[in-house]
Curated annotation (Swiss-Prot):
The keyword Cell membrane applies. The chain crosses the membrane at residues 30-50, 68-88, 99-119, 136-156, 169-189, 205-225, 254-274. It comes from Mycoplasma genitalium (strain ATCC 33530 / DSM 19775 / NCTC 10195 / G37). It is found in: Cell membrane. This is Uncharacterized protein MG320.
Amino acid sequence: MINSTKGYIDQNGLAAKQFVQTKQLSVIRLTFMVAAFGIFFIFLVALTVQQLLSRSTLIDLASDFRTLSTIAVITSFVSLILYFVTAFKLRNPNTSLTWFWALIITDVISYGITLGILLTLATTFSKQVNFEANDIVYAFLGASLVFGSVWGLSALPSQKRRYQQTQTLFHILLWAFVISIVASLLSFILNFTVFASTTNLLDRIIPGLSLIVGGIFSLISVYFVSLQIRNEQDLIKYYESEDYEMARRQSWRSALFFGAWLISSFMNLVYFILRIILITKNFSRV
């Protein structure tokens, strides 16, 4: 019995060691894998919302918009609370992954509902609001181009470093923070200066999500950057002490937390680009 238990522990430890050491499941790839799946499920939620709204009558549609927008804003604030909670729990080795999965799920629900409403407007009321599905596609392509460029540029200086996966991840998250806070600040400035007299589609549908939540998220991202530095030190400590099981758990906690951060940063940038597209179209229409 003792030998079988010891064999199980050795086998489990070997699996954990292989998990950490393999290049295909490094921290940075794990983080981007989480973010990619999160964005994929955002699209699934958005398409589901679009299908539900497409079955509503014109009379019920306005009420459905308000209800779904309220749910989106509430879940976005719940997501912010979970960011704070999981940030404090990230470095605790006994923290359950449930907290981090909850963070991902609330992000997916919030951004998925918002995107579903926008898809409905773009497909059903495109002429009335001067808004098309192509605008959403261009916004996603623009955000993907920015984040892809940041990923490529961030990977260049870290090729010769010993722990390049965590160093590269830190650079990407740092730039994600810069992109997010600049987009939120520009949105805030434009709303109260140049475009104070114009009504924007995103402001009518989700004012809290486009400004308040984006601004708060950008501010707490300052703390996330410093948190990543300490988290990187924890991972290096586990690697050097050959505590591979703990390193694996910490890698998953890190991937889920910072993957959620990448999802939020990416979607904030998408909405900002979409905002600029709509403003440009409104000006050209005038």
